[in-house]
Amino acid sequence: MRPQITFQIIEVLTGSEDREGRLVLVDGRLAAVLVRLSDQGHEPLLRGAWYIEAGFGFLDGRHELFASFDEAVASIERNLS
């Protein structure tokens, strides 16, 4: 059976303006915390990108950056295969 991926909107205390986040749950278990980059300290091209702030299990140690939320989702799905 294919694992079920769900996302929960959450605000993340990052110490910057990057607060918009998503908990990534795989079959109800926390797999990652994604954060949308919005701080003016980032390069303009990076603003709006999504970053794996923290990963667990198969995403442990993966601090990847994605141009969009959809790209992040696609990468997580590929890593589950």
Predicted regions: what is each one?
Residues 1-2, 77-81:
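Short intrinsically disordered terminal tails
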Residues 68-71:
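Alpha-helix N-cap recognition
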